[in-house]
Amino acid sequence: MGKHRLTVPLAMAALLATSGLVMADAATDTNPALMYGLDRIHVGKTSVGQEISKAGFDIYGYVEAGYTADLSGRPQNSNTIPLRTFGSEYGNHIELNQINLTLARAINFSDPNYIKRGWDVGGKVQFLYGYDSDFIHSNGLNFYHAYANNVSTSPLYQFDPLQLYATVAFHLGKMGDLKFKVGKFVTLLGEETINPTKNFFYSHSLSFNYGIPYTQTGVLAEYVPNSQWTFYAGVTRGWNQSLDDNNPNGVDFLGEVAYAPSSQWNFAVNLSVGPQDNGTNNPYRTVVEPLITYIPPILNNNLTLISDTTLGYDGMGNASTGGSACWFGEALYQSYVINSYLTASLREEYYYDGAGFTIGLTTPGVTGNYGDLTAGVKITPFPSSNLGKNFYIRPEIREDLADHAVLTNGKHYQTAIAVDAIYTF
């Protein structure tokens, strides 16, 4: 999930990760503020930060707070905005969306010590606290209510163990590298991610909100034969499942094929197949997701173009007839780095919700068609400061459309403005 995105430096880092020069969860995601502080805690002739780094570990995180205002008027009989399941603003208040703290040991495929030894171990422990936690709880780690993703918002701010996994990698010489990941991890699917620092906007696409899982628990293998190809394959307990399972021990196949022929192009196809419906292992749910990223050589490589296509099928998704349902989403992104202070981005999206299965704003069995247009900027006020460059704000304006009158105050459209502030450490 989320390997093909953002400004040129991050997009290039993603391409390097796909090429196998570093692992996808490598230390390129980290920020200096927390480690800088740990380096100032001395223990004898060394420091806490130095000892952590010497062991190959890194500690980092971020804080995000934001506000969304529905310009179409407050939704009737609701404190949330339609089409905003993830990150919706409860009661139109400024909210602490996420506090994230991560302890990770990345595996670097280009590390001479790893190549000489032929293997290495790593992992990640990632905790989340804030308003967003209630939307991403996995089944079995939902401490606040009976089942995952029921968005009860009680209490308003919650804790979630977002990722808990171990990794082991083997260098195969000229055949490349092979890594195994075991535990709970964010899904491969999706251009957008739970981590707001990897996204263009504060708000999320409809495909991210409704068309794919957030996390999965199981075993995932990653094979990198060369600098252009990466293959993923594994089995999980299913969409947003962890210690508990919503069906009789059903397993889901999760896979990806990624191809990066150059620093300008990145192609990937994600696949999820398996039983996801409550209480049954039949029929299956299938999602196929082609992702394309292009960084044209014009404009000094400051322009990033992305296409994210989601095609889904569930064999019993029609609540009215008990039959199948399909969904389709197409999200296009354009992001341009104007200078070190400012990045401008656009998102255009269409989403087809067959039989009302994924979004559910229509009457059960009734298909809905939706769209959103989002424009925003990322403002980094202190780009030259070692610590200040990690702070930025992202104002945006978003227009949502629906072919049924199911949006704010029973309308076919709604307009919202929003802004969030993020500090990474």
Show the residue positions of the predicted features.
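Surface-exposed coil loops of outer-membrane beta-barrel proteins
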Residues: L71-G91, D134-A258, A268-P275, G365
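N-terminal periplasmic/intermembrane-space "pro-region" immediately following the signal or transit peptide
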Residues: M1-S78, R84, D111, K116, ...
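Residues on the lipid-exposed face of transmembrane beta-strands in outer-membrane beta-barrel proteins
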Residues: G61, L96-R105, Q163-V168, V182, ...
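Surface-exposed extracellular loop regions of Gram-negative outer-membrane beta-barrel proteins
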Residues: L103-D132, E222-A233, L291-I298, N302-Y313
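Outer-envelope exported proteins of Gram-negative bacteria
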Residues: G56-E64, D120-L128, K179-G183, G234, ...
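Outer-membrane beta-barrel pore domains
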Residues: A27-D29, L34, T85-S88, S133-I136, ...
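Glycine- and aromatic-enriched membrane insertion/assembly motifs of diderm outer-membrane
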Residues: F86-Y131, L332-A344, Y351-D353
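Short loop/turn motifs that connect adjacent beta-strands in outer-membrane beta-barrel proteins
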Residues: I41-I59, S72, I107-V121, H171-L178, ...
